[in-house]
Amino acid sequence: MSYKCQLCGKGSVTGGSYSHSHRNTKRTFRPNLQKQKVVLEGKTQTAYVCTKCIKSGFTTKPVK
């Protein structure tokens, strides 16, 4: 499974890690994913969702 948000599709991005002497090293920036129970297509499923989707209210939590 790829490291992506299952709601918005946000994934890993490559970039550079620069030191004080301006040496460059490749690295990956990964989204802050949280495992949450979410209602998807009428069913309760466990999904990996980024914190931006959680804060903005894109997720609908299942009724207990």
From Swiss-Prot:
Recorded GO MF terms: structural constituent of ribosome
Gene Ontology CC annotation, any one: ribosome
GO BP terms, alphabetized: translation
InterPro entries reported in the protein's UniProt record: Bacterial_rp_bL28, Ribosomal_bL28, Ribosomal_bL28/bL31-like_sf, Ribosomal_bL28_bact-type, Ribosomal_bL28_sf
This protein's record includes keyword S-adenosyl-L-methionine: no
Signal sequence interval, chain numbering: none
Record key words, sorted: Ribonucleoprotein, Ribosomal protein
Pfam families: Ribosomal_L28 (PF00830)
Domain of life: Bacteria
Family membership: Belongs to the bacterial ribosomal protein bL28 family.
NCBIfam families: L28
Name recorded for this polypeptide: Large ribosomal subunit protein bL28
Organism annotation: Elusimicrobium minutum (strain Pei191)
Lineage of producing organism: Bacteria, Pseudomonadati, Elusimicrobiota, Elusimicrobia, Elusimicrobiales
Gene name in the database record: rpmB
